């Protein structure tokens, strides 16, 4: 239920030209904010399409966008669509990594966009793995294990006993679930 005090607080922010997402709210107000779905409460991400020489440091236009984004407390990404097109055509992982290294990049723009989007939306991925398949599930960062299990199937939440976890990097370095479990 929205309160008059809360709505007046939001109105004051908007009248002052301040996006609702930049307001300071108490926990109970944050719940009201989530229910109200104000457009300016939504997170923002600025993506600048730049030439290949401007990926790391940007250019005059992207610097203007970065200045605005700083005021709005929003992240920015410089991505070169022409480079992304070129990278998307490379199927060999080793060749892709070499090309990224030559360009002074640690990951593709698409990967950065996904990582930034997940962070901005406070999401994470968890994997379920069995003998036949491994599957990825997207959940909110604050999701508890029983609720995450319920994302797969409601019966899993009802019958939840425990979660056995291993980080993705540990899973890969150990060479699978059993070896990761054995190594602790």
Language-model regions: role of each:
Residues 1-184:
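C-terminal-of-GTPase-core extension/linker across diverse P-loop GTPases
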């Amino acid at each position: 239920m929205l309160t008059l005090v809360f709505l007046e607080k939001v109105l004051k922010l908007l009248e002052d030209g301040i996006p609702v997402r930049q307001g300071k709210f108490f926990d109970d107000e944050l719940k009201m904010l989530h229910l109200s779905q104000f457009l300016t409460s939504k997170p923002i991400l600025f993506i600048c399409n730049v030439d290949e020489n401007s990926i790391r440091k940007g250019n005059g236009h992207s610097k203007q966008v970065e200045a605005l984004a700083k005021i709005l407390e929003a992240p920015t990404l410089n991505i070169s669509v022409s480079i992304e097109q070129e990278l998307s055509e490379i199927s060999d992982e080793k060749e892709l990594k070499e090309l990224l290294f030559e360009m002074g990049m640690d990951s593709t723009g698409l990967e950065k966009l996904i990582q930034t989007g997940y962070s901005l939306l406070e999401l994470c991925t968890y994997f379920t793995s069995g003998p036949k398949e491994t599957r990825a599930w997207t959940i909110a960062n604050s999701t508890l294990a029983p609720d995450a299990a319920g994302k797969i199937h409601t019966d899993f939440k009802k019958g939840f006993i425990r979660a056995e976890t291993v980080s993705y990097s540990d899973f890969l370095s150990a060479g699978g679930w059993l070896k990761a479990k054995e190594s602790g």
